[in-house]
Structure formats: C-alpha cells, structure tokens
C-alpha cells in the first residue's frame, strides 16, 4: 500500500483490511498518494456523494437525455450507482441537474434541476454571474419516483445536502445576485436564511456529525475576477451564530467536505491556475493541512464515505492528451483507511 508520507505522519495508525477494488479496475499507486482507481462503467461525472451504506453514490452524470448547452454539448442528470460501477439508476430524465445528496435513511434523495423551468435561460452552473435561475430543489425515492418539489420561486437554488440525522436540509440560494446559505426542515417547510452578507458569496454547505455545525466556503464578489478566485472555508451553527474561518490563506480553498470523525475536512486548493489538489484540513485550527492528491490537472469535489474508509473525487487524470483543464472528468475512489477518518466510537 502506497501511503502519503505527510498524511501518514499525522494520521492515527489504523489496522484494517484494504478496501475491495472493483473487478476490472486498475489500481493506481502513484507517488505520494494512497491506492486509488477510476470507477468503471460510469460516464463523465462530477460531485459524487456516498449513501449511508458507504457503497452507493449519487452524482450528476453526463446524459444524452439532458438539455444541451449553448455549444450543443450534452448536460448532466442525476444518477445513483455503486462505487464498483454497477446498479446505475437514472433519477431524473429531463432538464439539467446540479448537486444531489442521500438522506441518511438511504431511501430518499434530494437533488437540483432546471427540469420545470426550461423556458428560462439555461445559465451556467460554473459562473456565479450567470447561475441558472430556474434551478429548484426536489426530493424523490431511490427509483426517482414520488418526486416532490421543495422550492418554487425561479431563483437559483442548489448546493443542497442533508444533516446526518435527516432532520435538516441546507442549501445555497441566490437572491438579487447574492448567494447565501439557507436551512429548512427535511419536508421543505420552515425555510430560514443563515447568512446575510453583501460581498461574501456562500455555498457548498455540509453538516458536521453533530447536526448543528455547518461547513461551507465563501468568496468575495469584489475578488471574483481574480483567478483562481480567493476562497475561505468556514463553519457556522445551524442558527446562524458562531461563524469561524477554518482556512487561513488568501488563495483558493474550495469544495469542503467534513469527515465522519468530526475532526477533519477535505477541501481543494489551487497549486497553480491549472493544478488543483485535494487536501485534508484540521478543525483544530492549528494543524497545517495535508495534501492527499498528487496529479498535474484537476482534482476536486472530494467526499468521504460514512465509514471513513473511502474518498470519492472527480479528476481529469484519465482524460486523453489535449483535453482541457476540466474536460473528461471521471470519478475516482481512494482507500483512505490509513487516515483514521471514521466515526468516533
């Protein structure tokens, strides 16, 4: 097992059998990284998150059924599948989908789509100034049935996740060109705004295991044209109090995700404008972050399985020669058992 020297130096010693590698997958043991592999049989995809069984994933996957971009390229729709690349299920069959997440019961899903607002401008999921204003939030079962629309206001709503106890949904909403965090009950009632900042643009919220603390990232509208855009990762309480920075460098700290032990978080940092890497951060506020990926290109959207043993992330490392920086993105899994990120007993 190849293990990052820097990560292993600070992580607790963990003795466990290696994570099972899917049949047909090729294990990568590149220098500095723990063993990883590309998920087979899944099309280009981004932002995958584990379900409670630490095996099934939900993600937006490129699909010919999705709406086309302004350049005529196929969009993305929500699917679930295993991290072995089996049991693929199409959850939504029209429009263009964004972020999605499992409820902790493993029976329900929450996802973002423009499916009911196709008469509105498509916008651009990657451009804050042009987010799709028709993006709404939905809940369904694991078969994509029993769909319930949670929002109905023709504003951009996305970046949606669920608390570990299943009682709360947190998401990002754009109002009058400004992004803020909102929380509501898991049935869609009781919407409440958490952040009220003019310059800071908050998003990517995730609950920590305590169901009270929310990890998120923010950038300043006044700095958006700097590339890579400076971003800071914060925590805030569910009632909107106790906002604290968790990264302390004025560069791009992006795509945070809390680990099941409640002590760490994954995030992405831009080493150069075209080399983004995954890091392990520490919520103690004093321990320097440790680099997890080592590849020239795009490594982003990291998430940890609930058992703490696997990290899924999106990478361009499998793209062919001449591919663009964020082109040909595929999902990969890394065996991070050695980091000891599982739930505290």
How would you describe each model-predicted region?
Residues 52-53, 104-105, 164-165, 209-210, ...:
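Residue-level detector of Asp-centered blade-edge/turn motifs that repeat once per structural unit
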Residues 17-44, 80-96, 140-156, 184-201, ...:
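Multi-bladed beta-propeller domains
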Residues 57, 109, 166-169, 214, ...:
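Hydrophobic beta-strand positions that form the internal "hydrophobic ladder"
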Residues 1-18:
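Long, low-complexity intrinsically disordered segments that are proline/alanine-rich
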Residues 41-42, 60-77, 91-97, 112-136, ...:
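A flexible loop/linker signature enriched in serine peptidases of the S9 family
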Residues 303-345:
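Blade-level signature of beta-propeller repeat domains, shared across WD40, Kelch, NHL, RCC1
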Residues 166, 198-203, 211:
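Right-handed parallel beta-helix/beta-solenoid
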């Amino acid at each position: 097992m190849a293990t990052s020297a820097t990560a292993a130096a600070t992580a607790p010693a963990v003795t466990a059998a290696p994570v099972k590698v899917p049949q047909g997958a090729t294990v990568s043991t590149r220098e500095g990284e723990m063993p990883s592999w590309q998920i087979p049989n899944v099309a280009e995809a981004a932002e995958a998150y584990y379900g409670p069984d630490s095996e099934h994933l939900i993600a937006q996957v490129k699909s010919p059924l999705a709406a086309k971009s302004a350049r005529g390229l196929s969009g993305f729709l929500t699917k679930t599948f295993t991290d072995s690349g089996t049991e693929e299920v199409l959850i939504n069959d029209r429009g263009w989908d964004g972020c999605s997440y499992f409820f902790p019961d493993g029976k329900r899903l929450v996802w973002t789509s423009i499916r009911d607002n196709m008469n509105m401008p498509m916008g651009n999921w990657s451009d804050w100034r042009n987010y799709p204003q028709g993006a709404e939030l939905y809940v369904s079962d694991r078969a994509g049935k029993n769909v319930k629309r949670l929002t109905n206001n023709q504003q951009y709503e996305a970046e949606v996740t669920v608390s570990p106890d299943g009682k709360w949904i947190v998401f990002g909403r754009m109002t009058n060109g400004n992004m803020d965090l909102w929380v509501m009950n898991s049935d869609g009632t009781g919407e409440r705004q958490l952040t009220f900042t003019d310059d800071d643009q908050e998003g990517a919220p995730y609950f920590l295991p305590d169901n009270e603390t929310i990890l998120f990232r923010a950038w300043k509208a006044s700095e958006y044209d700097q590339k890579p855009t400076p971003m800071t990762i914060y925590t805030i309480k569910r009632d909107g109090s106790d906002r604290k920075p968790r990264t302390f460098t004025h560069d791009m700290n992006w795509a945070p995700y809390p680990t099941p032990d409640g002590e760490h978080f994954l995030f992405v940092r831009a080493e150069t404008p075209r080399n983004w890497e995954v890091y392990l951060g520490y919520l103690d506020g004093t321990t320097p972050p440790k680099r997890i990926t080592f590849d020239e290109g795009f490594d982003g959207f990291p998430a940890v399985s609930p058992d703490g043993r696997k990290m899924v992330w999106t990478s361009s490392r499998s793209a062919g020669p001449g591919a663009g920086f964020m082109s040909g993105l595929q999902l990969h899994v890394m065996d991070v058992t050695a980091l000891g990120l599982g739930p505290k007993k």
